[in-house]
Amino acid sequence: MTGYFNNDEATHEAIDSDGWFYTGDIGHLDDEGYLFITDRKKNILVTSAGKNVAPAPMENAMVNSPYIEQSVVIGDNRNFISALIVPSFEAIEKFLSDQGRPTSDNVLMIEDSDVISLIQKEVDSIMEQFSHYERVKEFALINRLFTIDNGELTPTLK
């Protein structure tokens, strides 16, 4: 690539002096030399302590829990990493029903101390695979899904 037409500034931002193209991707090489793209540089959070944290791996790990439907990790310019978590209300409803406390009210579910403890155990277990500074320290449970219509998601679901 030779650069942007009649735009030297944009060319210098995108291509270094050796001809390497800055894609904005973050990745790593494994032991066999394979490249894994793991995130986008613009998606990185920088904590108030200056630690760079990629939120996507944590968000993806959390939604693998049967009790977590959606998660958003926050922490840019903050002392620690937090998360907004939408529980899997179907799984939570079953969890409470199995305890003899059936409810289908999302607000009651997210305020229930046993549900909060259950999600805390899930988050703690999931966070063990991450560095100490990357781990979600606090979370808030949200009583509805993040949607485009509510303005919480973009059309590309970000």
Where are these regions (language model features)?
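Conserved ATP-binding/catalytic segment of the ANL
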Residues: 1-47
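Flexible loop/turn segments at secondary-structure boundaries
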Residues: 2, 29, 36, 44, ...
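A generic "binding-loop/recognition-motif" signal
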Residues: 7, 41, 58, 77-79
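Adenylate-forming
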Residues: 15, 34-63, 92-112, 132-136, ...
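C-terminal boundary motif of the adenylate-forming
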Residues: 26, 31, 65-91
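Conserved C-terminal "lid"/linker of ANL adenylate-forming enzymes
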Residues: 70, 122-158
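Conserved loop-to-beta-strand segment in the C-terminal subdomain of adenylate-forming
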Residues: 76-101, 129-143
